[in-house]
Structures are given as structure tokens and as C-alpha cells.
Amino acid sequence: MSPPSQDWSTITDANERRKAQNRVAQRNYRSRQKLRVELAEAILYDMPSWRTAVGLKRKRWLETPQSVEDHDTNPDSATPKPSLSSQVIQYHEEGQLVQNPTDFSMSADADVTADVSSGGESSDLSLGVFTPGDDWMNAEIDWTAAMTLAGDTSASEPDLRHRAVGPGNDIHAQPPVSIPVQAASGQHRTLTAPTPAESMSLRTEPPETAVITVTSNREVPNLGDSNEGSRSISTTKQPSEFKTPVLTAIAKGKLDIARLLISSGANIDTRDMHGRTNLHYAVSRSDAKTVRSLLELGADLLMSDASGVTALHMAVGADDQDMVKLLLGWCEQQDRTASSTDHKTTLKQCINSRDGQNMTPLHLCVVMERMDMLKILLDYGADVNIGCD
């Protein structure tokens, strides 16, 4: 048990003095919290929806007007704590509210506490005068109805609910329940009380995990209407591409392991459900290192997905000039090292390939008005006469 404030000077140990001060501060905090709870029960006593919750405490308010903190009151104090029920609420014999809860203020005479930095000297903690505020609101009580009963019509219902719940919590939409209430002035008002589900929803809940699908919109040529220069298509990016041992080896930079797997029968051009290969995904990520490794291991650059889109179409659509130069440069190198003239057609086939709409990368670039990309394709010999059917 902590010593009185006048005996703190006898405690020479700083840790013991600090513990004693903390105990007094905690006792004062509990005292204030109990006062606030009693005040809330008094305000809501005449509300029909809450009569059951506080009905058992009516007798204490009417017949036993004593401080709720008698056990914490300093016995040496000349002025004991005032009775909360005598200051806050007065009732007729019928139990009707006759004093407006907002017309009074309550002064909390806190116990004497000590300042830790004062070296053991005690200082009085004066709380001053406080009125019902946001700091003691209970989220499970309908404070909208309480404020309306008290005559506070300056704030709207959403604002009052914001006070009760706080800015960080959400209120689930529930059908409100209307209840009639008779105020002290005799006027009948209709208040909105929360449903049980709404009361439960006022408590803070952890956020739920959401699954997000990333969608990118790109402008591509509109072949159906010659008056429009472009159209927008939605390309949904899968959360993760399919993985194979070969691709794992490439991702780790172990091309010797990848070659061993390929020589053992591994297919480097395995398609997924959309017809895309590892090369398609590497190009879409602008992963030049993986693209170069896949091409060196024999990936087919001319393979298209279910929509007829090749890796070059994908790079042109993304306006990835470096990737386009990498793909076309690799095709040009393949043609230079080809043994016969018949096999020197890789660049031509790649740059003039058509997608599902019979569009070449050059045609796609023209419709999307990408001048720099168009110059790159022309430098590599793209055919300007190939059109759509």
C-alpha cells in the first residue's frame, strides 16, 4: 500500500517512490472512470431501451447517495468527495428526469499525486471542471439517443455516431429501431436506437484480407470502325505465372542446370491456360535477363498465346523499346549465323507476324501513334504494306 503524500519524503529509494506515485495515479484514474460510468447510467436511465440495463442501479441512485469512491477517499481530507447522485440527477417520485444532464458540470477532487521529476515533492493533480465528452463514451451505448434526449440538436446523427465510434471504426448499416422517449419538458421525441447487430458492429474488428487483381488498360487499334483511332482492351495480369524446373533454374541464373533439364526432355515453351509461355511472361515483366536466357536455351519467339499475341506484339503494346530492340536484335543475330539462306527468315517472320486481329506490330504501332517505336520497326525492315483482312 502506498504511503500518504506527506510520507513520500521518507522514501529515499527512487524506484520505490516512483512505484508509490504510480499506484496513486492508477487509483485516481479508476476513480474518474467509475464516476463517468455512473454519470452515463444516470443520463440514460429514463430511456426505455436502456431501462433494463440500469434498472437494478436505480435504488443506489435514489436511496444511497454516497461517493462511488469512498474506499479511495483520503481519510485525512477535510472535505470528502461530493456525492455523485446528489450533484448529477434528481428524480421525482415517479422517476422522471427533472434536471437536464447538460446543465451541470462535475468537479472531480482527485487524490494528491506526486510529480516524478520533482524529486519526491508532492503536487496536487487538479482536474478542474469537466463535462461529458468523447473520452468516456461507450461504443455499445446509443449516444445519438442520449444527446438527442439532452437537447443537443446541433450535431447531425452521422456526426454523433462518429463521436461514439471514433474515426477508425466502421458502422455496419442496420435498419434503425425507433423508440419514443419523454423528456423532462414533457415533449415526446422519437429516438433511433441501435439494433443488437449494430451494437456488436461498433467494436473494432481486424481488417480482412483482400485479393486484388491488377488490370492494365492499353490502347490498341480498333479494326471495326475506321473513324476511331484506338480502342481500349483490358488485359488481366495473373497473380503468378506457372513455374517449371527450367524457369526456376533460369531465375537463379543456373543456365547449365536449365540446359541439362532441356536435354533430358524438359519443354521450355510450356503453355499455360491462356496459351502463354515463359517468354511471354518475361517480356511482360520487362525482364531482359530472363528473356535473353530463354532465347539462348531455345525458346520459340514466334509462339503466340490464345489471342494470337506474340512476345513482340506484347513488347510493342507496352511501348517497351529496349525489349523490342532485344527481340529483333536476337532475330537478326540468328539470321546472320544461319547456315543456309532458307533459314535466314527469323527476323522477317517475327517482325511481320500477325495477332488474332491480323495486325502486325507495325500496324499496331501506327494506330497507337507511337513514333519512336515505329522508327525502330522500320529500321529492322518491317513490311509497311501488310494490312488487315
From Swiss-Prot:
The alphabetized UniProt keywords are: ANK repeat, DNA-binding, Nucleus, Repeat, Transcription, Transcription regulation
Decide whether keyword DNA-binding is in the record.
yes
- SUPFAM superfamilies for the chain: Ankyrin repeat, Leucine zipper domain
Name the gene: apf2
State the GO CC annotations. Answer: nucleus
InterPro entries reported in the protein's UniProt record: Ankyrin_rpt, Ankyrin_rpt-contain_sf, bZIP_sf
**What main location does UniProt list?**
nucleus
Comment, domains: Contains a basic DNA-binding region at the N-terminus which is usually found in bZIP transcription factors, but does not contain the characteristic leucine zipper domain. Instead, four C-terminal ankyrin repeats were identified that were shown to confer protein-protein interaction of regulatory proteins.
Q: What is this protein called?
A: Apicidin F cluster transcription factor apf2
